[in-house]
Amino acid sequence: MKKGKKKPSFRTKLIFLTLSACIISTLILGIAQMVLSVFHFSRQARSDLEFYLENTSGQFDTRIKNMENMVISLRHNNVLKHFIAGEAYNEQEAREQFANSTDLFSEMNMVDSASPFIDCIYLFNENGEWVSSRFYPETVENMELQNQIYKEINSSFLKSSNEYWYMTHDERAYVCMRVYNEEMEESGCCIISLGKSAVDTLFSKTKEYPESSWLITGEKGQILFANEKGKEQAKQMLEIQDLGSSEEKIGNQMTLFYGGKTGFGIELRMALPKNLIYASIRSTVQPFAV
């Protein structure tokens, strides 16, 4: 007779069960750590994107507020009060006071060391007279051409009933607003020129986020500046009325969206695709998976 198979001893069974328990525990721990890591990286990636939206929109809002402060300061300047009212004034003194009040070379106006947010500003009084200040020097011939352009913009604006008026030309956006004296009576017009290069610099980090979009508009949806994706998605972005931070479907993808109103009727909208979060997780986790 053949001998029957020898049954495993209790010790062998115990070792097997112990090893099995260790392996299963290690697998469970590894899976748990992976899930926690993915959750952590996801939160971190989302936080980074939200910080970018908040930081960039904050920088833009700060510069628009600086514009508002400039315009408000004009009616409180004793020399410019007389100019705005069309009363007797010293032309040279008015120009100097206007340049000092607007101060286009201030840190508040600079996006970087070479890019002013406002590159030129004109103030017209009731009589159609003007003073101006500009960041870049101009030839006499070009100054005369610029004066004519701003006079035409002023004339077109005053024919409208709008509080604000916008025009884009030659990679610039012109923002027009009515100026009031201390009695809040309409006394003139201020025209501010914003250069595209400075605005592009302010939003330059969006190039690091594929498929991201941003859009700057006037109060009636006129596009002042936008990146290519922003132009493509302008209609859908402008349909979003609940401004602030939210998740919105734009095109075929979900996005982290920010929309906000600033001064002079200007609005900013930005959107970053949510799939950037997963792309960030992938790039972070991938080295450990190899």
Regions found by a protein language model. Name each.
Residues 1-12, 40, 44-48, 162-166, ...:
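N-terminal sensory and localization modules of signal-transduction and trafficking proteins
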Residues 133, 141-150, 168-207, 268-273:
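Conserved beta-strands of PAS-like sensory domains
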Residues 103-115, 183-225, 229-231:
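Solvent-exposed, extracytoplasmic
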Residues 3-43, 47, 289:
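Extreme N-terminal signal-anchor transmembrane helix of membrane signaling/transducer proteins, especially
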Residues 182, 208, 219-220, 228-288:
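Extracellular/periplasmic juxtamembrane segments that couple receptor/chemosensory ectodomains to their
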Residues 121, 177, 213-215, 221, ...:
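Generic short beta-strand
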Residues 147-162, 236-249:
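Soluble sensory domains of the PAS superfamily and closely related sensory modules
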Residues 47-55, 59-153:
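Extracytoplasmic/periplasmic sensory segments of membrane signal-transduction proteins
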